[in-house]
Amino acid sequence: MDEPSDDENSEPTPKKIKREWVKSYSNKAMEMMKKMGYENDKGLGKSNQGRLEPIIAVQQDGRRGFGLKLDTVQSSAGQWDPACEELEIPEPVLWLHNPGSRADAYSLDQLMGHLVTGEKKLTLDGETRYCDPAILHHILNAKTVFDDLNDNEKRRARSRCNPFETIRSSIFLNRAAVKMANIDSMCNFMFTNPRDPAGQTLVAPDELLYFTDMCAGPGGFSEYVLYRKSWEAKGFGFTLRGANDFKLEKFFAASPESFDTFYGVKEDGNIFDESNQDSLNEYIRMHTPQGVHFAMADGGFSVEGQKNIQEILSKQLYLCQFLTALKILRPNGSFVCKVFDLFTPFSVGLVYLMYKCFQQIAIIKPNSSRPANSERYLVCKYKRSDAETAGIVAYLNTVNLMLSDESQLDENDVLEIFNANELAEDEDFLRYIIDSNNAIGKKQIVGLRKIAAFAQNLELKETKQSEVRQECLKRWGLPDKLRQAPENKPTDRLLDELLADWANERSWLSLPATEMKGVASLNATIKNVADWYFVPVGREETNINACSLFLCKSRGNLLRYTEHKKWELVETAFEVQPRSIFFGQIVYEFYGEGRTIQRMAALHIIDGICLGGVDIRRRPYRERVSMCDKFARSLNKPYRKDRTFGALRSKPLFRLQDMGSFFANMRHYVLKDNSQRLGFALDDNKFFVPGGIMMFCELTNNYVSAHSRSRGQLYYFNVRNKESYYKDQIPRNKADEIFASFRFSFSCRLLWKWTDLRQVEELATEDNPKILFRSDFVKFIADKLGHS
């Protein structure tokens, strides 16, 4: 990749040449020289003439020998004029809109007529249809000059001359993450905050932001997205196994629990394999049937010694990344992909087909991408429907098979995939490609010449690096600080942070639920059935299965608050994001029935205080439960083959007034000992056996909800001062007074425990004031609703 591309993400810091030469000598040496007549700032000659500093020793680099003469282009470049370089912050983004024919205008048969094969090309010479010939000539010449420089020289010169160099990887594991932050900012955060053409969000309130990161090890793009969105996003990673795999343990700026790696049906992460592409699509659709909101691709490989034909060598990689994106994206989805030179008819034809599959495209060069390389990014916005893009997907599949069949392409190659003459008829597209290539090419020539100048003249220095760093980080929404590993704080200190103003008085943490043992206890506690909700809870066979508070301190470090008021490590492995504290229960979920039944531990979340650092304690009860559900869906990986963690899900929530339908949906399951128990079916062919229900009120003691007949709206009524507020007109300062916080809901929770199998039978009853039967509870609810 031209002057190593952006898989330059972890580079050694170059050694500095000593400038303050005086410090290189001991005080004794300087004193001896002064005794012999030496004076500061005067030469050593008889008349104080001569050099004022020592001759610097030869800086030997690598295997370079004495007497080497660098190319005249480089030598002349030793003089650098800063006016040659134009900095644009922010960078302009020029969108190309596609108002013309749609993707479904092309069938597979029609597109096959565009295919051109011929003798394999191993040079870009003559590829001037889509750029100014002079620019291509200067780019290729400028790159060739660097063959005379070794890696250390190039690296040192690049570090000194690039105005954006000191941004480096910021708080992330590599520079790719910073590039994604830069691109997201350039494009008005269209990836982490996607909106439709009318400006409305494309992510529903209870929906996760789904994304895919392809050919992306070690994962910088994903680290940025998770830094920005945390667990409100869920990512799918696809890359080659091996040395360039994802390094999730190196995610310091974000937690990787919401990231799910998948390597295809072949288990190798090879994106050239059609079966891998299709299995990735199937895996994603199991989680989100519509597809992902956006896809990112950052593929590249070493082209050492063949930098000038990187585009030709990367053609199948381009195609497969584009093709996979079309398969996995939902309608209105977006795509960003790293590409290099776009001079050949093959590459331009690929971009044209993507242009037809989306409403808008842009080719951008972010400032975080070094100016001297040919790297750029294709950004595609608002994907058209799968039905519209089906013909192009089938065509790209066919071309990929041809490229993969080495026997067919031993000497020949696919040279064009869309007729160049027909493409040229789309004047807007043609002009866009030419202008883009020329603009990026001019900047690249300037960048290459600047590196050559700085390599030749060690006195040159870029003075804007500090100023540019601060401005860019601010614009991209990144902190100006160094990367550091997350701190593993002591339990009490972390609790102080997460509980905040609830930390001083913690007695409520150990408050038990109030048990309902008869209709009298229901009458004493439940004023308005409409304000109450319930979740089914497990049987609590042991203390470990009791409903408890859970605290995740760090990755793999989940604690449970015991009845002894101590935090103990949970032995079962669950993948929970650090800085989380919530109320939940470890239950056994079952798969199958009878003697073949299998059971596995699962963690069910009931309510939350803080989820992955997001404070939800004072949000209304239903909103907290909805966020707990999103949190669990983001972290859970139900379809992984190598499941090393227990399942994570939120408890199913029901309105108390819907208890009848809750029981109607339960059925009897046969357990391993041939006993039959009422079980609750989960959404993945599993079930669990409840041992009771736990109830929560969404309002504080002073309020009840009611329905206004005159306005047809819900309102909240204060039973003490008789004030009332419609749901959509609640003052901000009243919300905390009306809606129960986590602490209030937790402290006032009720428990109906099923200690007798007859309690949950539909018609069973008994005149026992200490046992609450289902029939009595259902009648209580009906009576309450009848009186409201």
Curated annotation (Swiss-Prot):
InterPro entries: G_patch_dom, mRNA_Cap_2O-Ribose_MeTrfase, RNA_MeTrfase_FtsJ_dom, RrmJ-type_MeTrfase, SAM-dependent_MTases_sf. It is found in: Nucleus; Cytoplasm. It is an enzyme of class 2 (transferase). The active site is at 179, 298, 338 (proton acceptor). S-adenosyl-L-methionine binds at residues 174, 215-221. S-adenosyl-L-methionine-dependent methyltransferase that mediates mRNA cap1 2'-O-ribose methylation to the 5'-cap structure of mRNAs. Methylates the ribose of the first nucleotide of a m(7)GpppG-capped mRNA to produce m(7)GpppNmp (cap1). Positively regulates the Ago2-dependent small RNA pathway, with roles in both siRNA biogenesis and RISC assembly. Involved in facilitating conversion of pre-RISC into holo-RISC, possibly by promoting the unwinding of Ago2-bound siRNA duplexes and thus the retention of the guide strand in holo-RISC. Interacts (via C-terminus) with r2d2 (via C-terminus). This is Cap-specific mRNA (nucleoside-2'-O-)-methyltransferase 1.
